[in-house]
Amino acid sequence: RRQRQMCIRDSEYMTTILSEYTEANNNMVELVICNNDGMAEGAITALKTAGYNASADKAIPVFGVDATDAAKELIAAGSMVGSIKQDAEGMAAAIALLAKNATSGAALMDGTDSYNVDDASAKIRIPYAVYTG
């Protein structure tokens, strides 16, 4: 039976998870998805300490979010599979447009036709980019 667990903070948490979910218990961690690259680094440390990810036959893929320089190095080294990169330039452009509209008296969403706009909640969704090296 597959279960989901949240990787909350660091390598200590991942070490605990790896001690509870083992091959011996027939309930092994198969994939680690972290909410940021710092958590992914901690997970990678814990996995390596437990003897994982040193070879392809005993590998558990790890993913993070932010595409930090450290994560890019881990991806290049083969220790991490990928990360999600936020589009800072796209976010800044959207914020600048909305600020301009708000200060000029224009309708807030004027000029947003090229964006992915959720009309039900007046949100502009800026796409993320997958980083795998």
Tell me what each language-model feature is.
Residues 12-28:
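Short, well-structured alpha-helical segments in soluble
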Residues 1-2, 27-31, 58-61:
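Residue-level recognition of the N-termini of beta-strands and the immediately preceding loop/turn
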Residues 31, 35-44, 88-103:
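Extracellular/periplasmic ligand-binding modules, especially the Venus flytrap/periplasmic-binding
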Residues 77-89:
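Short beta-strand elements at the ligand-binding edges of bilobed clamshell
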Residues 90-133:
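Hinge/cleft segment of the Venus flytrap/periplasmic-binding protein
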Residues 3-8:
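Short, small-residue-biased leader/transition segments that mark boundaries at the very start
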Residues 34-36, 41-80:
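Venus flytrap/periplasmic-binding-protein-like
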Residues 1-2, 13, 17, 42-46:
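Short, solvent-exposed amphipathic alpha-helices that sit
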